[in-house]
Amino acid sequence: MPTLNQLIRHGREEKRRTDRTRASDQCPQKQGVRPRVPTRTPKKPNSAPRKIAKVRLSNRHDIFAHIPGEGHNSQEHPMVLIRGGRVKDSPGVKSHRIRGVKDLLGIPNRRRGRSKYGAERPKSI
């Protein structure tokens, strides 16, 4: 604990805040190229392998992004769009890939939550 005299001479140093959106440059979405798609096991109580893509963004940052939904069509070096949003049970994964945009297809035959998975509207009978 500093004395009053020390505080008058030097003052207090403010804490530096860490930037949570450093990779995205404050943008809501960011474009990138995916070099590879590994699977990763989640934290303790959960066990299913999570589909995670390492993405090199247009500003040369490398991040890990979650691929939502069942199945995906990732080939070699496709263009993808990234949005924010962490995956609670996967450490270091702070963004999601947007389905149905660029080279990542939406989920076919999906009826509920279609906007989250890039699914087309079903034809009514």
Swiss-Prot record:
Q: Does the keyword Iron-sulfur apply?
A: no
Quote the subcellular location field of this record. Mitochondrion
**What domain of life?**
Eukaryota
| Alphabetical keyword list | Mitochondrion, Ribonucleoprotein, Ribosomal protein
Parts forming coiled coils: none
Q: Which InterPro entries match?
A: NA-bd_OB-fold (IPR012340), Ribosomal_uS12 (IPR006032), Ribosomal_uS12_bac (IPR005679)
An example Gene Ontology molecular-function term: structural constituent of ribosome
Q: Where is this region: Disordered?
A: 1-50, 106-125
Q: Which Gene3D superfamilies match?
A: Nucleic acid-binding proteins
Instruction: Please list the residue ranges that the record marks as compositionally biased, kind Basic and acidic residues.
Output: 10-23
**CDD domains, sorted:** Ribosomal_S12
Q: Its Gene Ontology biological processes? A: translation
Annotated Gene Ontology cellular component terms? mitochondrion; small ribosomal subunit
- Name the family: Belongs to the universal ribosomal protein uS12 family.
What does the protein in this record do? Protein S12 is involved in the translation initiation step.
Please name the PANTHER family in this protein's record: 30S RIBOSOMAL PROTEIN S12 FAMILY MEMBER
**In its UniProt entry, what is this protein called?**
Small ribosomal subunit protein uS12m
Q: Which organism is it from?
A: Magnolia grandiflora
What's the gene?
RPS12
